[in-house]
């Protein structure tokens, strides 16, 4: 940005802020800023430099060895966060695609995921799908440009399998065998003795207009049994079912109901296409229809289209160099009836051992609602078997087949394996990269389900579609993003795909450019369109650096977990947690993951030295409870119970909650399985390493009785979350003072208590890894007790930290195994320049006990200045306003003098301003300010992102959750200039520049709100 405007000289008091005097020094038009449209100018050089050099280590580089300083401080591109990159189908220009790749690379990100999404486009005429649709020549040209530029910049490109979601191709119709299908039903009611003669009943729910074909699968009659009715379902008697399919002639059936005094229903079951198209289409010409996700034909339709239309020779060559993963969004298959695939009856009989068709009435759906039921237990069992079969077909014919195909040209498969009643835990184990989402997941246990599948399979990455908020367009703050994601990382997430980055321009869009999800039906949309259009992009490399370091730690080595929770039904995105562990165990330091039956057939499912999957998550106990998704009944497959028996005989502790004496298999008992199960369970419960309890409050005591304690334990119950990884002899512990769900009551409060960590060797010492700055230092105060280390953790809500336990000398540390403090009355004891140092913020004598010989050292500190609240600020504002085009920003410069800090909406001149503000003040320090003196700068409340400069020196990135900065040695005797640069969202400006969409949004309290305090400290060497 350049400032070619002159500043006015007028100054006047503004009475709009009570108890504050705001002097407006000037306001004038500034330079125009454009960031992306191929028809516009390049992003201003000043902003490009700001994004490219924003953090201490912003750019991807060659990875250092694990345990080295550079390994943590400067993670390489493959570890760095990615953007979901939304294109308006193929209406893109290769030059603009290359420019946006550069913007993302310069900002310190490691990759993109290309998706054809345009929910904000209400007028389909804007997009000529014949010329610019997904899969068109222009789409392929965009792919080639993205891959080519990504290769140059060291990024990876993920490719979505179809336009928007779910996966669809334009080479099929709803009547094609490869299209997603449903089983619809027609029904006629008959009284006892009544005769039906005529066409078989037509479906009660009309087909999609595009689905012209319907095939009759079966015709059945069954008597109503009100004893089996529920509040929403009509009860039926399965023993009375009559199969009339063979009696159908020319589409008609004749049948007389028994004259038994009952009411009868005549069902016709019709197989037809759902006609589902991908979200917010059309995206192609001809129209793309969603494929059958449960058959080889559906998968073949995907692979055939890619092979013929997308995988050109240049694309194949570039994928080999810059390709990342093929991506599929959540399984949002929509049906007015029951999802189906033609081979389902035969596959069901082969896999479950009995005929599915007699049980169809208990499976039928009408607009997602169950309509009929047999007896409660029978209905639950049959529905379990149905969805288990569907899950297996999805995993076999869709996930496994696509994964194998994608690998042939160099792509992994990343997918969100939820949305149906299928075993997402099992699917997560099959995928190269399973993915969850912050918008759709109810709480952290949803991530723990996918993490269990990932870790039992021996994979590394659990990805997350991150930071989408309903109504959050152009008002999403990075602080909110960080608070959301902090807990997800503790639950197993270690790859962030940010939602998202929109292509710059589209005809007819308003400033600040094309955004995939806003406006949404005329209102504020969801998700954010990050990029240079945002003022906070100036600080974006601080965010990418932080996220990259989180990933680096949480992708290191192997996970370490405490307990595996067995799930009979492997759903996720449900918010259903684990008894005791979710509510009580996690707040005490325990960690758990969920596993399901298919995971027990993996090579990792072995017990070694009493540990399950010792080479992976290393579960030290197994917990089994009733199936929440089957009416909280105690169910287990016989084969699973037998494996549990083998596990505990090999030494694995197992705790079972509930009455298992009457346990049943989850599916239909077709031959004495219930009796076999109970016999195996009787043996299991008699084992010495097994405990059965009936009260969930007794879980902790049962584990203690078995000698199982958490690897991380807290001195008190708290909101502290943790994740543990082990790599190359080093234990990494990630901590977050986080929330179990996005909205929790009461809100998370600050924590400050002792935490005890298990270490691999008594030689290991603790290091603090600063996720914001990339710096590492040995921790100065802790106690040791054999294989444990105890230290104090104090975190504000949402704040994070990483502790590593390893041999002396890691990360370039020079303190070796020298003595440390075990206790102190000072504010803190730290290693500074290799020497043990006590720090105090008030005059007095401080007593520190050292580890070596338990020696006590007294340190006297005097002359510490009092904390000072900083006032008298000059504020220079870049006011970002709509420019001449949708992608051009007009910058208006404003200069103000503030006697006291206030949020921008409370300053009349800034009430509707978005942009960047630079706050400057001067602090005079006396002659006593010499060696050993320093200060913390507590910024108080800042909205949204910020950076701090002292005497012209830009400091390390600020912790945006707890913005307290150590000014270290940058202060000097005399005058010191402190500058705080703050960047905002665009929400406040859009309220007035585009009121039809954003006018109802509340103003956000931008700026440096404070109070800003200088907190002096004195240091003294004690080592």
Where do the PLM segments sit?
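N-terminal export leaders
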Residues: 19-24
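Short strand-edge motifs at loop-to-beta-strand transitions and within beta-strands
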Residues: 789-791, 919-921, 963-965
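Aromatic-lined ligand-binding clefts that engage carbohydrates, nucleic acids, or primary amines
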Residues: 923-951, 978-981
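C-terminal segment of N-terminal export signals and the immediately downstream linker at the start
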Residues: 15, 37-62
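Carbohydrate-binding surfaces of carbohydrate-active enzymes
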Residues: 79, 93, 98, 134-165, ...
């Amino acid at each position: 940005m350049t400032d070619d405007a002159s500043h006015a000289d007028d100054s006047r008091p503004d009475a709009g802020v009570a108890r504050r005097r705001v002097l407006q020094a000037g306001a004038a038009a500034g330079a125009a800023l454009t960031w992306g449209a191929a028809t516009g100018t390049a992003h201003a050089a000043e902003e490009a430099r700001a994004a490219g050099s924003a953090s201490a280590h912003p750019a991807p580089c060659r990875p250092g060895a694990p345990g080295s300083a550079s390994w943590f401080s400067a993670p390489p591109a493959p570890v760095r966060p990615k953007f979901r990159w939304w294109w308006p189908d193929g209406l893109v220009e290769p030059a603009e695609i290359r420019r946006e790749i550069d913007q993302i690379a310069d900002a310190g990100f490691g990759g993109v995921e290309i998706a054809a999404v345009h929910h904000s486009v209400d007028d389909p005429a804007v997009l000529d799908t014949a010329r610019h649709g997904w899969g068109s020549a222009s789409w392929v040209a965009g792919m080639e440009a993205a891959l080519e530029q990504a290769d140059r910049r060291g990024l990876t490109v993920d490719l979505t399998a179809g336009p928007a979601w779910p996966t669809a191709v334009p080479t099929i119709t709803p009547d094609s065998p490869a299209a997603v299908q449903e089983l619809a039903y027609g029904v006629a009611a008959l009284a006892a003795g009544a005769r039906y003669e005529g066409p078989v009943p037509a479906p009660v729910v009309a087909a999609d207009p595009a689905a012209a074909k319907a095939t009759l699968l079966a015709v059945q009659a069954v008597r109503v049994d009100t004893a089996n009715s529920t509040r929403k379902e009509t009860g039926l008697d399965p023993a009375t079912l009559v199969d009339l399919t063979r009696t159908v002639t020319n589409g008609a059936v004749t049948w007389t109901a028994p004259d038994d005094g009952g009411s009868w229903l005549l069902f016709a079951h019709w197989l037809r296409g759902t006609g589902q198209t991908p979200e917010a289409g059309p995206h192609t010409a001809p129209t793309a229809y969603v494929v059958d996700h449960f058959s080889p034909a559906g998968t073949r339709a995907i692979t055939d289209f890619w092979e013929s239309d997308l995988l050109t020779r240049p694309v194949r060559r570039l994928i080999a160099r810059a390709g990342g993963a093929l991506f599929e969004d959540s399984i949002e298959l929509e049906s007015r009836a029951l999802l189906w695939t033609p081979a389902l009856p035969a596959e069901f009989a082969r896999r479950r051992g009995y005929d599915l068709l007699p049980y169809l009435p208990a499976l039928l759906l009408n607009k997602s609602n169950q309509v009929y039921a047999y007896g409660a237990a029978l209905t639950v069992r049959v529905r379990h078997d149905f969805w288990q079969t569907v899950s297996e077909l999805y995993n076999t014919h869709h996930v496994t087949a696509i994964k194998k195909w994608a690998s042939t040209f160099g792509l992994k498969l990343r997918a969100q394996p939820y949305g149906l009643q299928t075993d997402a835990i099992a699917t997560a184990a099959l995928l190269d990269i399973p993915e969850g989402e912050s918008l759709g997941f109810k709480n952290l246990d949803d991530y723990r389900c996918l993490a269990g599948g990932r870790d039992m399979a021996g994979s590394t990455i659990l990805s997350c579609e991150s930071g989408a908020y309903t109504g959050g367009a152009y008002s999403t703050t990075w602080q909110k993003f960080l608070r959301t994601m902090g807990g997800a990382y503790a639950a197993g997430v270690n790859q962030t795909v940010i939602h998202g980055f929109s292509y710059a321009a589209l005809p007819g869009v308003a400033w600040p450019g094309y955004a995939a999800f806003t406006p949404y039906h005329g209102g504020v949309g969801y998700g954010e369109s990050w990029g240079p259009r945002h003022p906070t992009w100036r600080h974006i490399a601080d965010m990418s650096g932080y996220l990259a370091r989180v990933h680096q730690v949480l992708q290191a080595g192997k996970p370490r977990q405490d307990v595996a929770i067995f799930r009979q039904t492997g759903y996720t995105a449900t918010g259903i947690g684990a008894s005791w562990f979710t509510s009580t165990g996690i707040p005490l330091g325990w960690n758990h993951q969920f596993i399901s039956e298919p995971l027990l057939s993996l090579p990792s499912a072995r017990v070694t030295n009493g540990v399950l999957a010792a080479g992976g998550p290393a579960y030290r106990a197994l917990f089994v409870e009733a199936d929440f998704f089957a009416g909280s009944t105690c169910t287990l497959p016989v084969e699973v119970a037998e494996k549990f028996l083998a596990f505990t005989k090999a030494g694995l502790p197992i705790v079972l909650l509930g009455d298992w004496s009457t346990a049943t298999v989850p599916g239909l008992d077709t031959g004495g399985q219930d009796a076999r199960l109970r016999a195996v369970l009787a043996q299991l419960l008699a084992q010495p390493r097994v405990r059965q309890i009936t009260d969930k409050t007794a879980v902790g005591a049962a584990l203690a009785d078995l000698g199982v304690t958490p690897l991380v334990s807290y001195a008190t119950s708290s909101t502290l979350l943790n994740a543990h990884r082990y790599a190359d002899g080093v234990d990494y512990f990630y901590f977050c003072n986080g929330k179990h769900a996005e909205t929790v009551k009461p809100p998370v409060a600050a924590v400050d208590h002792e935490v005890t960590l298990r270490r691999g060797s008594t030689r290991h010492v603790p290091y603090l890894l600063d996720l914001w700055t990339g710096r590492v230092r040995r921790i100065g105060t802790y106690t040791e007790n054999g294989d444990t280390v105890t230290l104090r953790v104090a975190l504000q809500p949402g704040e994070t930290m990483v502790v590593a336990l390893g041999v002396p000398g890691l990360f370039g540390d020079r303190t070796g195994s020298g003595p440390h403090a075990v206790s102190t009355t000072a504010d803190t004891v730290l290693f500074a320049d290799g020497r043990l140092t006590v720090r105090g913020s008030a005059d007095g004598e401080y007593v520190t006990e050292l580890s070596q010989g338990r020696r006590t050292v007294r340190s006297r500190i005097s002359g510490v200045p009092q904390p000072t609240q900083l006032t008298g600020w000059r504020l220079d504002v870049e006011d970002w306003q709509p420019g001449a085009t949708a992608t051009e920003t007009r910058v208006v410069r404003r200069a103000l003098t503030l006697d006291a800090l206030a949020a921008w909406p409370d300053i009349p001149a800034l009430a509707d301003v978005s942009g960047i503000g630079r706050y400057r003040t001067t602090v005079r320090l006396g002659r006593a300010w010499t060696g050993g003196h320093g200060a913390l700068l507590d910024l108080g409340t800042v909205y949204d992102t910020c950076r701090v400069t002292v005497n012209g020196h830009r400091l390390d990135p600020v912790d945006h959750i707890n913005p307290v900065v150590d000014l270290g040695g940058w202060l000097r005797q005399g005058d010191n200039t402190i500058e705080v640069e703050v960047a905002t969202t665009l929400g406040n400006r859009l309220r007035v520049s585009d009121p039809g969409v954003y006018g109802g949004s509340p103003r956000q309290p931008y700026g440096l709100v404070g109070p800003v305090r200088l907190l002096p400290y004195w240091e003294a060497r004690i080592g």
